[in-house]
Amino acid sequence: MNKRYIFAVYVNGKVCKVYDWFCETDREMKLQACALCAGVRAFKKSAGILVYKLQEDRTFLVCHSVNFNNSWYIHQHAFPLSTVENFQMLPDILNGKVNENKEIINK
């Protein structure tokens, strides 16, 4: 059975692109993450991938990372499935610029 994953591409600690993919196995997910990271790192050496997996309670949780720097801050280690409906805003939500209610966060 396919599982749903969100692959977040980080460059210098900020989310710059997000992909929503389905994978049959954990191995396939890890291969996708490695391939995506290799492609991005060809252009940006400071890139890493963080993978979120859809859980049974309809939330996405961090489940895997590739070349993810420990000094990078993760604003969202989990988020509800409803957040993905605003897929274009997902990078801003993961960067902590916007909350799930589309409200801009001033820091």
Residue ranges of model-derived segments:
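Secreted/extracellular small peptides and ectodomain modules produced from precursors
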Residues: 14, 21, 32-35, 61
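Conserved aromatic
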Residues: 20-27, 84
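A short, charged, amphipathic alpha-helix used as a generic interaction element across diverse proteins
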Residues: 24-45
